[in-house]
Amino acid sequence: GADAVEKGAIRRWLESKQFDCPIYRDEEAAKSAGYKGIVAPVTMAQTFGIGPYWKPSDPLAKAGDEPKQINIPVIFDVPAPCTLSFATDIEVEYFTPMLLGDEIKITSKLLDIIHKEMRVGKGAFLRQEDTYTNQNGEVVAISVLTIFRFNPPENVTELKKRKH
């Protein structure tokens, strides 16, 4: 499972953005602002909800291996004869703040599949809704992710024809 919300991860997240706000590091400041305690930035919901990319029982990566990807369970569990994909958009709505010690769980469901032929190839848009909840069952965030899964044209000439 995923790790609990903790100060070190919050600090590292903020350091990379060179951003400081007392509610993310100081108990009194967070309480003065109306929170129950130190909170995590809302945009960390996915960070705290995702399990590990690699576990000790997994094989070690070798030179030339494809990089590990974030597990997107529903969209890529749908059987489709597609070889490529890209994310087109994500919408996120935030609700209950994440506090130190919270354990975030993600529940995913497929919303729809819309078949479409685009310049890059024939494929389908798949939309997935992820609901992030804490250990108390409170909704932290809801996101809707759209990914286009497709097969590219057989050859470059066909792709060039589509551009004109």
PLM-predicted stretches and their roles:
Residues A87-H164:
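HotDog/MaoC-like acyl-thioester-processing domains
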Residues G1-D89, T157-H164:
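Hot-dog-fold acyl-thioester-processing enzymes
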